[in-house]
Amino acid sequence: MSEVKIAPIPDLGQRTDEITIYAGPCSVESAEQFEEVAECVADLGLHWIRGGAFKPRTNPHSFQGLGEEALKIMKAAGDKYNLKTLTEVMDSAHCQLVSDYVDGLQVGARNFQNFSLLKNIGIVTAESHKMVLYKRGF
């Protein structure tokens, strides 16, 4: 069995024996929607809120996410409710942009072999000391 190393998340003062829960909508659709969710997350005593800013779809006419506008919405709500923010990065061209707005960058399982993306996330987070969440499975 592999050894699991647990480290505290900076700036939150969390103990290493606590479970960190990330809650939020699949997609940031509006400032009102995200702020309502942020208020609920804060009321629950959680520290992190997540939301999708970029939502690539196979149908080019489907909602693709709000992009940078979603990142601005997330930052504003995070600041208002004292929450850390997290979103998935799927394109290496977005690494710096995402890092400029959120506290944590998420990499989904489908991008574990996307070495350009992983390299760029490494470069950006080495400079900014942002957290990276590697999400496998559900």
Language-model-detected regions and their locations in the chain:
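Conserved anion-binding
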Residues: 57, 111-138
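Structural preference for beta-strand elements that scaffold enzyme active sites
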Residues: 20-22, 47-48, 82-86, 104, ...
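Active-site mouth loops of central-metabolism enzymes
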Residues: 19-36, 59-65, 83-88, 108-110
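N-terminal amphipathic alpha-helix/helix-capping segment at the start of soluble metabolic enzymes
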Residues: 1-22
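Glycine-enriched alpha-helix->loop->beta-strand junction motifs that scaffold or abut catalytic
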Residues: 45, 97-107, 123-132
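Conserved, mostly hydrophobic/aromatic
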Residues: 24, 41, 49, 98, ...
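Glycine-rich, proline-tolerant flexible connector loops at the mouths of alpha/beta enzymes
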Residues: 50-69
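Alpha-helix-loop-beta-strand connector modules within alpha/beta enzyme cores
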Residues: 63-87, 121-131
